[in-house]
Amino acid sequence: MQVDAMSDVALFVHSTGTGPFMWTRLLAALPSGVTALTPTNLGYSPATAVPRGQVSTVADEVAHLRAQIPEGTTGVHLGGHSYGGLVALSLAIELSLAGEVAVRSLWLYEPVLFAPLMAHAESLPPDVAQDVAWLDSDPHFLHDEHGGSEAWLQGFVDYWNQAGTWAAMPEKSRAMARMVGWKMYQEVRCVAREARDFAHYQFNIPMTLLRGEHTTAPAREMAQRLAAVNPQAVLTVLPGVGHMGVVSAPDLVAAELAQHWGRVAAL
């Protein structure tokens, strides 16, 4: 992809089991001089397939996405949803340390970092602790033998939506999920085992954090804890939606992204 000399890009990282399509309705009003990048995650295309049994890490994802940033880019705005939020945070750290491209801002819808919640289970609210304990103790969810299987996919999709969602999905959508089931499992393993403590993700750039009113208790806690270590962050609760609000309520989310661009421009 070509970008104009001295150009900024806005790179959006999609969530587990979705794709770049989730960003389409959000990109109608990018700031002047900013080019959108919506790459496909590692393993979601035949060229980058992750075969069953192969471990895929956050570092692998970051390297894959970093390679998508065109030569000549001067600044990067990073966005992400769920697992994509963890990757966006990690990419922001790597780019900042490298010093090659300035990270301008972060816009994240419910970034998922289960690992630091698991590490501090004793300090969690009861409803959060209950969910986290289930994820850590479930005999199937974080075990390679079952990861990405039909039963695993059903459990994953129903957890982030509601019971029966997997069964109600069109067969074409279920078939596509099966094709990337192992990589989906690897992404869940990353958020549960590789995510660092919240204090690791401290920045001094504009940050917007969004969560749905009806999201899960852990997702609520993750957003709050990430905001606590980033006092400059704006944390907004979107009424009437849950974890998948980017897909289910794109106009509502797009309005919040427009607010983010306004805050960035005002600095």
Language model features: what each stretch is:
Residues D144-Y185:
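Conserved alpha/beta-hydrolase catalytic His-Asp/Glu region
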Residues E100-H143:
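Flexible "cap/lid" loop of the alpha/beta hydrolase fold
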